[in-house]
Amino acid sequence: MAGDMLLLMRGLARLSQAVIETQANSLRSGGVQTMQMTAEQAMGVAMQKIQEFTGSQQSVSDFSADMDSKYDFTASEQNFESAAHGGLDSDSVFRDANTGAANTYSQAQGKSKLFDGYKDPTSQFTGHTRSYHQDHSSVGGITAEDIEKAREAKQNGSKPHKQMLSERARERKVPVTRLGRLANFGGLAVGLGIGALAEVAKKSLRSEDKNGNKKAVLDSSPFLSEANAERIVRTLCKVRGAALKLGQMLSIQDDAFINPQLAKIFERVRQSADFMPIKQMTKALSNDLGPNWRDKLEMFEERPFAAASIGQVHLARMKDGREVAMKIQYPGVAQSINSDVNNLMTVLSMSNALPEGLFPEHLIDVMRRELALECDYIREAKCARKFKELLKDHPFFYVPDVISELSSQHVLTTELVPGFPLDQAEALTQELKNEICKNILNLCLRELFEFRYMQTDPNWSNFFYDPQTHRVALLDFGATRGFDESFTDVYIEIIKAAADGNREGVLKQSIDMKFLTGYESKAMVNAHVDAVMILGEAFASEEPFDFGAQSTTERIHNLIPVMLKQRLIPPPEETYSLHRKMGGSFLICSRLNAKISCKDMFEAAYSNYWSGRKKGPSQ
């Protein structure tokens, strides 16, 4: 039956595409109503089919059992109640200041129940502002509880703690069963088809863009309209897990890959994941830490201050007074990696959202492996401790302590760090921003060529700058991986050749690394070498490189179509995460308009690399 469901999703997509092709002319002549009726009928059939499958959970589990057997996901899937938990919109917690007295009372009462036992966690500190790497827009409305907290904070000389969860985030139960998650993707497939029809209708009824504006790589399909992007965001924020992780990866791409309007919407994916109801959250904690986990804490805030793809983060205070951040994994996420990735790739493939040359099968395998590692919080704790040891004497970076007694397979607790994420660093002086970026790039080179052990997630919120100590805390080590010497030996020579302006060297080393086969077209070879040379310009410049003024994005954009269409083999598996980290580090430098000397930095890394090896380059 699960196979029938997937066939249904694909069939609906093909139906939508066929209607688009055959009825475009009728749209121009006023046939919009006919199109809407066709779409509504398709949606009705889909919803009826999904309802027929409601009682068939076992067959779906059998369908995906063979996929699970290929991966070592030892945590058992939890049996949570199937009744849907009522969603709690942000407006029901943070009321508008102009609401009536009766409504005010009822909402304040609900909020009081939600935060029962809450104490201001920052009242013991003075003159200290903490940020929680989420959407930082203000929240309207003041309750009696807010006023009381403000008074207490004023008496203690500190600012009150403020929830930084995005206003768009809603309290919604995580779909735990595979059938429940599949139904959400089925609804998304239908919605995308309807949205595509509507987009074609709008485009056919308005004049074409004559401004000659360049389209982004993922901006060529009616399935990727703004309305459909909204549908994607809503679904990803609800199901979370592997699907949401891909949306977060899209959110950190620049405008050359994603239309700026779509990028803004996908940015919400990074900041606006829904969060678990209290009942589901506490059950997850009790399952992992035992029923008496609260006895180890003086305070635990039941509303999370951050919600991401795999888990949500809560503020707590231990009995010894230390403030900690408790990351709780969403139930069922680890067990649903295979089905989530398959379902999402089906939706993206049918909507033509994946450009040619991405090698989806290879990409799927890489995503599965990375997500399986990120769901293992015991492994992440080990990675954090290893990085803490590697950077123990670093004057600028540090790693917060892991709290072992409150950590497990699905719960990771670390000390809470002060400061703010780098996306709020734009107001700092340019000299300070240059120093931050220089340290980030230097750390990136050390991770790859000295440690051969890299945290590969370049999310802004994984770098917290504390202006009081002038240090940066490094967070989130779930995406940490190692690199073999056989890989770094060749990769460092590719960068060296690019920095030296040696095109033949770039080509030779690229073939050795299996970026190219040696049988590509001349156009493909030139595009690949050009891209590497462009990326190596920062390490070639004798003068400080101006990341804010560089045209790297535009020039790489012009090469992407050729590389996607004429690539013969997928790139090395290691480069997916490596280039995500390096590209993200360059993007941070660009956003902060950094102007730093990188040539000396790379030459020092190159010299140290080979001096620490038994053999020299090309030996």
UniProtKB/Swiss-Prot annotation:
An example Gene Ontology biological process: phosphorylation
Keyword entries, A-Z: ATP-binding, Kinase, Membrane, Mitochondrion, Nucleotide-binding, Transferase, Transit peptide, Transmembrane, Transmembrane helix, Ubiquinone biosynthesis
Main enzyme class: transferase
Database matches in CDD domains: ABC1_ADCK3 (cd13970)
Domain of life: Eukaryota
Residues at the catalytic site: D457 (proton acceptor)
Family from the record: Belongs to the protein kinase superfamily. ADCK protein kinase family.
Subunit structure: Homodimer; homodimerizes via its transmembrane region. Interacts with the multi-subunit COQ enzyme complex.
Free-text note regarding domains: Adopts an atypical protein kinase-like fold: while it adopts a core fold similar to that of well-characterized protein kinase-like domains. The KxGQ motif completely occludes the typical substrate binding pocket. Nucleotide-binding opens the substrate binding pocket and flips the active site from inside the hydrophobic core into a catalytically competent, solvent-exposed posture.
Protein name: Atypical kinase COQ8A, mitochondrial
